[in-house]
Design a protein with these regions (language model features):
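Active-site-adjacent structural elements that line small-molecule/cofactor binding pockets in enzymes
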Residues: 1-317
Length: 317
């Protein structure tokens, strides 16, 4: 099993020297990948409901000071040599398909094949409006089409595409990504459309357990989600064994309720031994990647937390 940690791309810890230090020290500790989140702008007034809190309030709504995702990925790539770079997640409709494909291919080349393209369709209507991208209600269809266009550009010598939202022909697209056929595509999300997108277009499923509408916060619920994904993948004519499973953890420990609302044990609640048991259970069901958000008011505090977690918990899995 591989373990990742979140990059501080907003607030005081996102200063160049701090961001670089967190990334390089995480790499030196033996973490396998770093995740980088995506918001281009934060609207002052947000009516859209954030999918991963019970209240629907976005925890970062007061912070407009955050780096553009793919620029930050390139910066981290230059500071590290081994860490995989996971976009967590890229809101696919936010960037034109051809430009997005080029930026991602460039990152994969310059990082020597370390990019994982985590993707989502987006949830913040006001951000879509500010960016002037295709309409928010069409985000699912736009995401699917942009992904297909990216694959065309990454894999074909004479790429052509004639879709509703993107069209191109008569283009040379080089260099191609280092990874073949292209960087792995991890599909974020827990809903039916996200599962169908994973089954049809994804190389991995990358959910968060805390979506109130689609909770995956107990092993029973997560196992049911995995089984549904495998069924949809077979229906799409693909091999479920080729779909990687990842899991993103935003909170853990004694502060969490011990039980999910289905009556089962809540994943990542309780003591260290409980969390080690959860990681083993996820591994047994086929999960190959788990990542965590580490807080801290200073770089020293964040790095110390990462080190303790790795030594006290991850080393026991």
């Amino acid at each position: 099993m591989q373990y990742g940690f979140g990059a501080p791309v907003s607030g005081a810890l996102s200063a160049p020297e701090t961001l670089s230090r967190v990334a390089t020290e995480g790499e030196a500790m033996g973490y396998d990948y770093i995740t980088i989140s995506d918001h281009v702008v934060i609207p002052r007034d947000i009516e859209a409901r954030y999918p991963y809190s019970d209240t629907g309030e976005f925890p970062g709504r007061s912070r407009g000071d955050r780096h553009e995702q793919l620029t930050a990925v390139a910066f981290i790539a230059g500071a590290t040599s081994r860490l995989r770079l996971v976009t967590s997640v890229t809101v696919v409709p936010h960037r034109p398909a051809v430009l997005q494909a080029k930026m991602l291919a460039t990152i994969d080349v310059l990082s020597k094949g370390r990019l994982t393209f985590g993707i989502g369709a987006g949830w913040m209507k006001e951000e879509f409006e500010a960016l002037g991208v295709p309409p928010f209600p069409a985000r699912g269809a736009v995401t699917d089409e942009y992904l297909q266009a990216c694959r065309e550009l990454w894999t074909k010598d004479n790429p052509q595409f004639d879709g509703k939202y993107v069209k191109f022909a008569n283009v040379l697209f080089e260099p191609k990504p280092v990874q073949k056929p292209h960087p792995p595509i991890w599909v974020g999300g827990e809903s039916g459309p996200a599962l169908r997108r994973t089954a049809a277009l994804g190389d991995g499923w990358y959910p968060i357990g805390t979506n109130p509408q689609h909770r995956l916060d107990s092993m029973k619920r997560f196992a049911a989600g995995v089984e549904r994904l495998r069924r949809l993948t077979r229906e799409a004519g693909r091999d479920p064994a080729k779909i990687d499973l990842a899991y993103r953890v935003t909170n853990w420990g004694r502060s969490l309720p011990a039980r999910a609302d289905d009556g089962e044990r809540r994943l990542f609640s309780g003591e260290s031994a409980d969390i080690v048991g959860d990681l083993r259970a996820l591994r047994d069901i086929g999960v190959g990647h788990v990542d965590f958000n580490f807080g801290g008011d200073t770089a020293d505090a964040m790095i110390a937390g990462m080190r303790r977690f790795r030594e006290d918990l991850l080393s026991r899995v």
